[in-house]
Amino acid sequence: SSGIGLEISKALARRGYNLILTARSESKLISLASEISEKYGVKVDTITSDLSDQTAPNNIFNFCELNKYDISVLVNNAGFANPDKFHRTSMEDEERFIRVLGISVIALTKLFLNKMLYKRHGKIMIVSSVAAYAPPSVIQSLYGPIKTFMNRFSESLNTSYNYKGITSTAVCPGYTVTNFHTASGVQDEMD
């Protein structure tokens, strides 16, 4: 509902794609959907969802099925970071982190991939990070490693399904000033 995800949404809308947006904040989603729909003349639907909830991927998929949405592009772009150094966070914090940035991406991809295989067409984008290639960080001990995993996962998907008309791309932006850095405490550590 902000940052890189917002810009990807606008770029797809400019190209005429109808959108289904998910985020935790219902009010932000409704406002964003209205803004994009009016500006670009596309249909925008929303589903409020927290990807740290293990039922979220199935709920999102079921919402799309119920509404008979034909998903041709899946963008996995949830932002999440723990607000402290590794030794200060709880195991529950780390599990939430892995669920949002790892397990939910795998689950959503698995669910929508089967529909794409049936159509023999689809595009999967995983928003990763240049942190996958950077030296390990004191600030976020798991962030770079999970982004490395996401890059390899995307490569594996592309190799495994490209011949069936499905492509997968990992996008690795560098440091980008967004709400993510403020909310996660990363900006404070960098200042």
Give short role names for the model-derived ranges:
Residues S129:
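Residue(s) in the substrate-gating loop at a strand-loop-helix junction
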Residues S1-L19:
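Canonical Rossmann dinucleotide-binding motif of NAD(H)/NADP(H)-dependent dehydrogenases/reductases
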Residues K85-H87, D93-I98:
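Substrate-binding pocket helix/loop in short-chain dehydrogenase/reductase
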Residues T109, I146:
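Active-site helix of classical SDR
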Residues R15-L32:
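Conserved glycine-rich Rossmann-like NAD(P)H-binding loop of the short-chain dehydrogenase/reductase
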Residues N77-N82:
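Conserved NAD(P)H cofactor-binding loop of Rossmann-fold oxidoreductase domains
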Residues T159-D191:
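SDR active-site lid
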